[in-house]
From Swiss-Prot:
Quaternary assembly: Interacts with CEX1.
Single GO biological process annotation from the record: tRNA re-export from nucleus
Any one GO cellular component localisation term in the record: RNA nuclear export complex
Pfam families: Exportin-5
Organism, as annotated: Saccharomyces cerevisiae (strain ATCC 204508 / S288c) (Baker's yeast)
GO molecular function, one term: RNA binding
Domain of life: Eukaryota
UniProt-annotated stretches for the region Disordered: 1200-1224
Note, other: Present with 3500 molecules/cell in log phase SD medium.
Listed SUPFAM superfamilies: ARM repeat
Signal peptide extent: none
Coiled-coil segments: none
Protein name: Protein MSN5
Amino acid sequence: MDSTGASQIVSALDVIYSPKSNNSQRQEAQKFLDEVKLCSESPFWGYEIALQNPTNSILKYFGLGLLDHAVKKNWNDYDEGKRVALRKWVMELNFGVQDYDTRYIKEKLATLWVEVAKRTWGEALKQTNPTEEQLLTSWVDMDNNLFELWNINQSSRELALIIFRILFEDVFLLDDLIVLKRMTVIQPLCVMIVCPIEVFAIKYKFSDKWTKFKANEEGWFSVWIPELNNALQQNNSEYIIRLLETLKTCLNWPLTEVIVRNDVLSSLLTCLSSNIPRAQSMALDSIHILLTRPYSNESHYQMTIDRVFDNMDLLDSVYESLLFDPTDDIDETKYPIIKKFVDMISCLYVCVPKIKETNGQIQKYFKLVLKTTYNPSLIVSGLTLDLWCTCLRNDEYLPKLEKYVIPDLLQFAADALVYYEQIDGHISKKFAEIDFQSKSEFQTFCSTYRKRIRDIIRLISCVELDLTYDWLNNRLNNYFSSPFGQQVLSSTFLDHKLEPYLGALSQYMIVECFINGCIRWKIWYPTGDDYDEKLDSILQKLEILSNQLIALNLREPLLLKKQIQNFALFLTMLKDNVLFTLLEKIITSATMDYPEINLEERGAESDAVRDLRYACGIELNRMALLMPESLKKIYPDLESVIARIMPNLSYHEKISFKSFLLIIVLKSSLDMKEERFAAIVDPELLAWSDKTTVVGLSDLHWFMERLGIVQIAEYFQRRDIDENSDLLSIPIDDEGKELKSELTKRWQSLFPVRATRMFIHYSMQSIKTDEEFKMLQDLWRPRIVPILPYITRLLYQLQSYHDPDNWKGLPTVVQSFVKYSTIERFWEAGASNKSKDEFIDEHMKAMQTLRDFADSVGHIIRYTREYTLLVLSAISSLGSVFYLLDESPDLLLNSIAIFKPGSNEISPGVSTHGWKHIMNIAIRPILKGCPKDCLGKFMPAFLPKLFEILDLLLCQKWSSHMNDMDMNPVPTDDDQMTEEILEENLLRQLTTVVVRIVIDCVGQGNANPNSAKSRLNNHQMEMRKIIFNDLNTLAPFLKLLNHLISFKDTKCSFNSILVMKCCLTSVLNQNNTVDEYFTFEVMKNLLLNVLCNSAFKDSFHEALYAFTVIFLTLCKEYPSARAFLFEISNGYNIDELYRNLRSVDEYKTQRALMIDFIDWVKSTSGKEDGNVDHAGDERKRQEKREAILKKANERLIKKNKENGDMLDDPNIEDGAVGNLFDDN
């Protein structure tokens, strides 16, 4: 290409954008333009094109793109002359900006300016006595150039603002690698140019050479704020927005003296009261930043909050102006601003103790917050609920709350305690359509919202008990005397989506909150002189309330269930006064007859009755744990009553009542404990060694026969069902219903897992002494040791059931049926591709078809597996009974991980969801619950194989997800979720559980027990000794951890790197084999897969620190480590890098050197992002930048700030590096 390159580029662009060009011509032109960027003259052609085509945005933008490419990709290859020339071209183009230049042209011009500044500005300040030439190449007059640009015209002024905005974003908000390398110079320069020089001098020590980089003694704030005030007077909305865009980026980091001196807050409040929506939105963000940023000068903070509270009338009027009537439609302009407004207002409560109420400011503030709490949007209302809960927990706030808001807040909370998601046409659902992407999200939020509302009622009940009691009595009387209340009292079953049921449920929830408030009062008030007198009064009131509620003749099962749960709460306060009354009520409710309901069939009404009975069983057992001595007095009577009702109970209900008796036996001072224990427990445990059980567990086909699959197959044959039949379309007949009923009864007591789990679980509750624990071990040891092999064998068969290879000997129709039964049809918020209601509807329809057999068998398989896992977890709570048994580790691991001969496949067919349950329900509790005196025997036998299993399992499952996958997938509506997305989501959940297992073992905090920041518990400290001191355990642990770091899941990778960080000082330089693994596997993984991969950007800083520690440690000891890094870095001078790192003490400087190294590796290995700079790629990069900025801004304005940058903590970073690599 010759000197006419610019004209050739213009011609090529004409071809691309001409409607007359064909695809072949466009492709050829595009190929030419891609090659242009590789030419050394390309920046000059870009400058020429942009300069000579000022009104042609397409040509100008492409020309600027060539300059941008040159700065970003080739800057390090240019000598100082070329760099200065490039800078002058960029300045000339910026100085030539005009009104006709589009917004995106101005953004591109500003970006070019900033890209040059990030690479050169202030570089000479690293020298002690820089020369004039060095100052020139360091763009010493950039601040002056910006003032020149500011004064040209209105467009140049706007461009200057964009330059500042992008510069400050890159320096203070984004993790920009170019900035990170020059942070020690570029951050102080930014601070210096925005503030007066005497203010800068208070914080920073600097020499005269620094002042050469500053053009205006007063700084840019003194320019922007008067400019903003003038724009507000002229109502120049566009200019106001541009000024605020820049101001918003520089409120968190300048010295607070600048903020106060320029009265920034007053200008922001004026913006807030304007009628310019975008200005209001940005003003709210900016005020929020000012309220939550750190202040080194307390008086500056006080002045800021005083100014805000003095303007409560203004804030109130702003809120009123933002309100709209949602019945017609949601105002999508005002609604986001309302959310920001309330978010900002709700963070102000922390300032209340610092405010002197001279003009009713605090009253006005709480009244305003209460007004926002009443907002019909649950999101808006919900933003204030934590504020009320926090204030109600803090005695400092109570006098003001009692004075201004408590009665109104209590009334609101009671009225708001409803199931919004179940009320058709509720106004909150209009807002939910905007705020939530799926029904399940809305349902989850409603649950959280109700929890906060309940907390408010509970806390008010505690601090204003008499007021709440009178209010509650009045409310209950009014409700149950109303038509709805009368309907509730006269009905057996109610529609759970209509007002009579929902209204009554709300009343019972309020009663529950009140009782919990009374329970909290006992903890909160004991220091009062009149405590005993007040307590007697409260107990009297509770007894009256309890008797009134018992007198209500409820039969609706789910309302009765709620009433029973409330009675159990009454018992915690009233104890013996109401024990027998409530006990009678619970037993009566548990055995209440519903003659119109067939409990053998599945349906909403029969499910409700079962739910009631299950709840009664739980509350009985809680009663026994709470008051065993009181119940001991009537134990013979209880035995007789329960013996009489046993024949009428289901198997599950029988176990609940037996558990009730067992608790009284074990927890009271009742005599003949061993005999009574044996009489209750042994008949159930004998089923484990029953001949039919032993045979059923010995072979998978026998196991399937025990499940009833043979009978189902015979029934299918009689109905001519084959493997091609659609079970969901074939209705179940009378014979099928009879078979299903028979199997259901069999499945209840198929294996004694539920009885075993409940008996052990309740035995181990409320243990008060070591003697009691030893007594329980002695009772359980002779019973557990013989049956443990049967329990684990059951788990083995449950795992084997899912393997298709194990079905091969079965008839084809049976294979098809078993396959159906292994399909998991569960509903899980955020994971299922249907709403909960849709899932239930489909399940109910399936119950009338032959698919119900497959669903039911699948359910009993999963239910039995879950209870078997719970049994193992419960057994582990017996301590040495489980952990000191030689066979325990192998029995457990061999039952869950079945290896296919000749392959590494583990338990084929077991779903990701199933594995998550296995790890959560059994493995984690077993790992965390091991007593200290059992660790040395159990863990070396258990951990190596466990880590190997987890590593193989996750690597197999992640193998198909590791290419081109988003680290943070965009949330998708349930209806759009494919099976692949569902599986990926479940895999992330499983991986999270595995990361938690790793953290359970070795922790994530500082390993130094003397450190103030040590977050390791005693169990983790002991586990670390076992893992780190045994190579057989450490090797699979490190292999698993290294893989966890590389899986493309943001949280998983980040947390795994934190684990790796906290292990380094304990494992490096201890063993040559381990150091070799770190060299050839861990460092390679961190460098090439994490640090050079933008997908791991959230883990970058932690990974960089870990890599630096490993690098410095191993390069000091092993020449082979340096040679290997030289090889994989494509020839970087590793020896020089090591020397440079060792020559500096501060980690920030080490970090800059490492970033240079990573840049080299990325550029030489082709891992740099954006090598092809098409318009689409540019747009994607801009969208990515905006997304990162959005996250950064959210962190900036959130209420609870991080306590500084962890990397700035000398105890963590510099100190750790310094100590670790000390030569002495």
